[in-house]
C-alpha cells in the first residue's frame, strides 16, 4: 500500500464509531497492528463548530470519545490566531459565542446588530432547514 498520510478535514463531523471503523479497516488492509495501520494521520477541525454526523437512530459520539482516538493521535497543535476576522473586539465576541459563554456586554452588542430588513424587491430571505422533517412540514 502506498498511502503514507491520511488527512481528515473537519474531523468534528466524523462520528466516533466511524473513526474506530476507519482505524480498524486501515490496520486490516495494511496488515499492520499499529494505529491506522501505520498511516500517518493528520486531522483538522474545531470541535466547537460542526457536530458529528452519526448513522440514523443513534446518538452522536465525538471522534475524541472513540476507543482509538488516544492511540491514533500522537500530537495536538492548537491554532489560536484568528485570520478571518481583523476586528479584535468582534473576534472576541465570536469566540465567546463559540464557547457558549457570552458576557452581558457581548449579548447587548449582538442585540444592537438586530434590525428589520426592508426588501425593495419581491425576493424573500432563504430559509435553511436542518432536518428533512421540519422542511416537509413547512411546505
Task: Map each language-model feature to its residues.
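Conserved ATP-binding/catalytic motifs of P-loop helicase motor domains
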Residues: 1-139
